[in-house]
Amino acid sequence: AIREFLQANARLDSTIAQVASSRSEVIRVSAFASMAMHWLPSIIRRFREERPDVDVDIRMADHIRSPYELLAQGKMDVIFVSHQEEESGYEWIHLRDDTMYAVLPKDYPIDGRTGHPLSEFDGRDFIMPAQGFDKDIMRIFNRVGVKPHILPTAVDDPTVISMVEHGLGVSMMTELTLRGRGDGVLLVPVEPKSARELGMAVRAGEGRQ
């Protein structure tokens, strides 16, 4: 795992240097909110070390597909997202797997378990997180044949957590998204262990210039 991290870090540094060297004024970056909050400050510092004369324009992603679309249209130079195999025309740098957690009310009967079976989501009121998480989450549910009752909501992550806290349903979020949150709810890793793959993407050929 350490070797994989070091290799990913080396590839990240190399790609940042290559993208930075090919831009004359602005490097355009799109990222999920959780990645922007926890990772982008250090990554932007790397860009500035490579090219202090180039500005970094950061845009928050409001859905899984939008960063890929912006990248394909040439409106973004770099995106930090979850891996979507059906998308094409980009080079992918894996950074880490982001573990999925069940988000449950405090009074949920977990009976001392250290993991939450995915099967227990079946038929339950489910509050879908923000940022188009549905693709990553539904891929996991479909893999095990689970069909929760997805509530018609379009709210941000803190609101999802608050709704769960007040007993309005359950949810599933990742470790990175939940960092520093969740005091009013139970956070239990799902079983079987599931994760979304997070990384950096550039247009095909961009990382080799």
What do these predicted ranges mean?
Residues 1-18:
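Alpha-helical "hinge/linker" immediately C-terminal to small N-terminal DNA-binding modules
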Residues 20-21, 87-126:
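Flexible hinge/capping segments at coil-to-helix
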Residues 24-88, 154:
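Central regulatory/effector-binding core of bacterial HTH transcription factors
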Residues 39, 135, 186-209:
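A late-sequence structural motif
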Residues 54, 71-80, 100, 146, ...:
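Alpha-to-beta junction loops
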Residues 82, 110, 124-144, 209:
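Secondary-structure junction motif
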Residues 82-89, 139, 143, 157-185:
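A ligand-binding cleft/hinge motif common to bilobed small-molecule-binding domains
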Residues 91-101, 152, 171-176, 183-197:
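Short beta-strand->loop
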